Amino acid sequence: MSAIIDAKKQEVDIIAEQLKNSVSTVIVDYRGLSVAEVTELRSQLREAGVEYKVLKNTMVRRAAQQAGIDGLDEFLVGPTAVATSTEDVVAPAKVIAGFAKEHQALEIKTGVMEGNVISAEEVNTVGTLPSHDGLVSMLLSVLQAPVRNFAYAVKAVGEDKESKEESAE
């Protein structure tokens, strides 16, 4: 018996470590999805660098307590799968929210972003945000716009002077 308990404690420790190290976690109820749909979801999550596991509620509850995350107990009812990402905050929410739109059977229970529990609505909202790279490129284009406009203005002034000089000759 103690070997089984030790194995379960190790599994809880692994889950707790995942929860601590992840910048984003989404907890879902996958009931009603076919095997093909779950496989499709797993492959989409894997492509985005997100780890997806079906876990026992008791183990997730104990791991969350160990990781210092409060407020998950009410969501850990029924079939539970956990998607975690250690790199991209938006990736799990983006993939799961998109998949949930196409497959009504997938229900988002809750999420954890940087240690804070968020609602299913907030997970959907985060899912609509662009990725980190997308946000960086948007910021860079906004920062480049004034410089680009200034360069166009300088070029236009130079062309205007050239045309005046040519017409004066």
Swiss-Prot record:
HAMAP family recorded: Ribosomal_uL10 (MF_00362)
Keywords assigned by UniProt, alphabetized: Ribonucleoprotein, Ribosomal protein, RNA-binding, rRNA-binding
PROSITE patterns: RIBOSOMAL_L10
SUPFAM superfamilies documented for this protein: Ribosomal protein L10-like
Function statement: Forms part of the ribosomal stalk, playing a central role in the interaction of the ribosome with GTP-bound translation factors.
GO biological process: translation
Protein family according to the UniProt entry: Belongs to the universal ribosomal protein uL10 family.
Gene name, Swiss-Prot/TrEMBL: rplJ
InterPro entries listed in its UniProt record: Ribosomal_uL10, Ribosomal_uL10-like_sf, Ribosomal_uL10_bac, Ribosomal_uL10_bac_type, Ribosomal_uL10_CS_bac
Annotated CDD domains: Ribosomal_L10 (cd05797)
Subunit structure: Part of the ribosomal stalk of the 50S ribosomal subunit. The N-terminus interacts with L11 and the large rRNA to form the base of the stalk. The C-terminus forms an elongated spine to which L12 dimers bind in a sequential fashion forming a multimeric L10(L12)X complex.
A GO molecular function held by the record: structural constituent of ribosome
PANTHER family, per database record: 39S RIBOSOMAL PROTEIN L10, MITOCHONDRIAL (PTHR11560)
This protein's GO CC annotations: large ribosomal subunit
Protein's recorded name: Large ribosomal subunit protein uL10
